Amino acid sequence: METVVDKDVLKSSGAELLPDGRRGLRIHDWEIETLRGTILTSLAVEEWEKKLKTSHLPEMVFGENALVLKHLGSNTKIHFNAFDALAGWKQEGLPPVEVPAAAQWKFRSKPSQQVILDYDYTFTTPYCGSEVVEKDKETVEAKANPKGEATLQWENCEDQIDLAALSLKEPILFYDEVVLYEDELADNGVSLLTVKVRVMPSSWFLLLRFWLRVDGVLMRLRETRMHYRFGEDEAPTVLRENCWREATFQSLSAKGYPVDLAVWSDPSSISQRLPVIKHTTQKLKIPSKV
């Protein structure tokens, strides 16, 4: 849900809302915007399936939804969208999660259809965002790709996002959350990819979350957090933390946790119960002006 902020608070923070009814703001050389649209039309679904070389897509794909963060001084753009996320799903190609026999019938589109789950129907993605340096048409260099864009490199680091500092009381200048895709796994659970952003006078922070629950079988949580502190003009750096968690219902039951599905509906409240299987921290140095 987008927030409404007092104009005086925005002004004192050096921020201004985007014009023409756009959702977002400009602050300290950053333009941060969320985009919203409807789910893919049947024609768009066919186009996406062709591009992704698949005959399967989530039930609800919000192809026009996006979060875009652009550093105006360098034309560096960090953005999040469903197509790139699904490209990551297709590339990773995980084996299908085994579904209880009693629930397999739910995946049939026709009563007589045989259920063959030979693909990752959970749409699990390793996606943690897209980034690029957009170059002006007059300044396209040889190292840029044909679109006039140069790629960026994340570096592994020991730095950590200061979550304690983020919990301090500070005015929220802008907050929004967008859904990229969602699938109810034929009423057998949920697969959901969302991204939300929060902008304060001192920094911006975002969370990209893939949440999967295959009822009675598996839970999977893949989260990407990014943080940027304003005022780092000499060496502007974005920190990124990736954390993957996963557990079977059987393993959680063995630890004494309840298996009631109502307990496992909110990933925010249960994340600490799921063991970490991967954790990395990286940084992105914003390049000089192109």
Swiss-Prot record:
InterPro entries in the cross-refs: Phosphatase_reg/MetRdx, TIP41-like
Highest taxon of the lineage: Eukaryota
Tissue-specificity statement: Widely expressed.
GO annotation (BP), single: TOR signaling
PANTHER family tied to this protein: GAF/PUTATIVE CYTOSKELETAL PROTEIN (PTHR21021), TIP41-LIKE PROTEIN (PTHR21021:SF16)
Record's subunit section: Interacts with TAP46.
Name the record gives this protein: TIP41-like protein
Taxonomic path: Eukaryota, Viridiplantae, Streptophyta, Embryophyta, Tracheophyta
